[in-house]
């Protein structure tokens, strides 16, 4: 085992770990990341985020790069296995107080690539 000092150890390098690494790097905090996978998983597990997350993306410097990879989400419909509507969740189409739309759709592997390249 190799002993190396760091201020923060991040276990997991998915979107949450990657955002945390980007935030901490802005404060010159030494981080080490442990991730069991060698490559980014090519299928999305998360597909939506809101204006608060976009504000965070702006603060870590990926807003403009990532905006090109998003779709403004005008709403979502949830259906059951028989295609019966369970929930119709329309989203406002106006900019929030944070300066962004309230709902975005995205492809998670694209986000992870941008977050990792930003470090």
Walk through the language-model features, giving the residues of each:
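Beta1/beta-strand and adjacent pyrophosphate-binding region of the FAD-binding site
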Residues: 2-16, 32
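Residue-level preference for beta-strand/loop junctions
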Residues: 2-4, 25, 70
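Conserved functional loop/turn residues at catalytic and ligand-binding sites
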Residues: 12, 28, 61
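Short alpha-helical segment within the catalytic ATP-binding CA
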Residues: 18-19, 51
